[in-house]
Amino acid sequence: NGYAEAWFELGQLYYTGQLVRQDKSRALTYFEHGARGGSAQASHALGTIYAERAQSSADSLFMDEATPLSALAARYFLQAAQNGHIPSAYNMGHLYLCRDIPSKEHKSRYGVLPDDRNAREWFAAASSKLFLPAMMNYSAMLLEGRGAGDMDTREADLDEAQRVYTRVIHTGSRVAMGKSAQESMERMTETARRGLRLIEEQRESVKAKGSSRGGE
């Protein structure tokens, strides 16, 4: 794996043009060597490159041209995530997350079919490693009941959402960061506080419905 990471580092040098003349084609080759050797960072780099190219193709000419690129991006993000790369796990959640577009268009754009259950599982994996963007998406899915396998788990989902939102707030109060990151953290913290209020409102609603049934 040491050789694989060396390929990744070499690819980074050529991709960014640091210390050597920039050569993105050569960088891609080195990243591929690294990915084949098991470097999660190299796989993530390839996923990022192909995702950016897919987006560029989708924005410019024909949507179908982006399909193989988006599929490649998803493949490499999955490879990296399975090797423990946390941002790639978050990216997989983002790719699977259902949107208000047809499934065929979703697959063309993101390289996978929409699947909220898969999205939730990947967000949960990254959230467990305290990756803040994943924590926000995971708790939002829990709150909205998206990707749930069984309605009987609703109370457990709300408990989990409360736990994750609370951890986001505590993290924001402890971590020192620059101005831009601080502003982003403040927005996430405010969203988390709003999420906690919504959780309490949902619990009160469930209690009220239970009471009304009991009185019938």
Please name every model-derived segment.
Residues 170-216:
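Terminal, low-structured helical/coil segments at or just beyond the last alpha-helical repeat
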Residues 9-16, 45-57, 91-103, 135-146, ...:
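Hydrophobic face of amphipathic alpha-helices that form TPR/SEL1-like repeat modules
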Residues 1-3, 16-18, 37-39, 53, ...:
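Short helix-capping/linker turns of helical repeat alpha-solenoids
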Residues 18-22, 36, 55-68, 82, ...:
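Short coil/turn and helix-start
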